């Protein structure tokens, strides 16, 4: 059971988890863990499932998924009849009015839909992942000199579960460098899995780029792959002018994570998100929703 904080009703909700029985069995049973290490965490497994989700045969999954998780398709740019495979549905674009972007340059917005955790006063040797499990920021980005620039900074971890809108966006005007890709495995990023496998973010396939934002300093913008994520697709053009709310990229099928790192004294995260993070609870947000402000 995954409990998260709902900002709208100021109370806790229980997340509906896609494939919850499978996740619990895989990460809690000896047989499941053996299969995980031998096969499921490997690129080959995610590639096979990604291949299936790109084929017309997978289209039959769409209606059941929409009904089971109460997905509002009226927000989608595409009609259901336009979708030829499950990944068409999973990577669907939303209408602009579905995720309005506030122009106020002082407002920090969420880069995507999902559940967010926030950590201030970043300790590079011990970044909290979930349930008190820590990892090294140095290990995460594999660049010691760059990591040192973010000492005492702020970290945002946005978890996109399979039921979420799976495109991620820029949070400010600016310019973004080329993407750096780091090889890794494909463990799940669901809290069920994170509590069983230490330092998942450092072990999984991930990509990051430096985003030179106009109002929030130089931001490390990282995407972490997960089980059954066929691909991390970057759609932005490096080293060109970017506007707040522009799409950066998207994940193909699977739960995934976006992590942002800010330098010291650049942003202030909203108190409700910070307080819930300290209690160990994620907060539900949508792309474009204000989550903080410029210092």
Curated annotation (Swiss-Prot):
What post-translational modification information does the record give?
Answer: Is synthesized initially as an inactive proenzyme. Formation of the active enzyme involves a self-maturation process in which the active site pyruvoyl group is generated from an internal serine residue via an autocatalytic post-translational modification. Two non-identical subunits are generated from the proenzyme in this reaction, and the pyruvate is formed at the N-terminus of the alpha chain, which is derived from the carboxyl end of the proenzyme.
- Which positions are catalytic residues? 113, 169, 256
Lipid bilayer topology:
Peripheral membrane protein
Q: Which cofactor does it need?
A: pyruvate
**Which Pfam families would you find in this protein's record?**
PS_Dcarbxylase (PF02666)
Q: Which InterPro entries has this protein been placed in?
A: PS_Dcarbxylase (IPR003817), PSD-B (IPR033177), PSD_type2_pro (IPR033179)
GO biological-process terms attached to the record? phosphatidylethanolamine biosynthetic process
Q: What Enzyme Commission number(s) apply to this enzyme? A: 4.1.1.65
> Which free-text remark accompanies the cofactor?
Binds 1 pyruvoyl group covalently per subunit.
- What are the protein's GO molecular function terms? phosphatidylserine decarboxylase activity
Q: Which UniProt keywords apply?
A: Cell membrane, Decarboxylase, Lipid biosynthesis, Lipid metabolism, Lyase, Membrane, Phospholipid biosynthesis, Phospholipid metabolism, Pyruvate, Zymogen
Q: In which pathway does it act?
A: Phospholipid metabolism; phosphatidylethanolamine biosynthesis; phosphatidylethanolamine from CDP-diacylglycerol: step 2/2
Q: Where does the UniProt entry say this protein principally localizes?
A: membrane
Q: What reaction(s) does this enzyme catalyze?
A: a 1,2-diacyl-sn-glycero-3-phospho-L-serine + H(+) = a 1,2-diacyl-sn-glycero-3-phosphoethanolamine + CO2
Q: Which residues carry this modification: Pyruvic acid (Ser)?
A: 256
Cellular compartments per GO CC: plasma membrane
Keyword Cell membrane in the entry? The reply is yes
Source organism, top-level taxon: Bacteria
User: Where found?
Assistant: Cell membrane
* Assembly, per entry: Heterodimer of a large membrane-associated beta subunit and a small pyruvoyl-containing alpha subunit.
Its family? Belongs to the phosphatidylserine decarboxylase family. PSD-B subfamily. Prokaryotic type II sub-subfamily.
What protein does this entry describe? Answer: Phosphatidylserine decarboxylase proenzyme
Gene label: psd
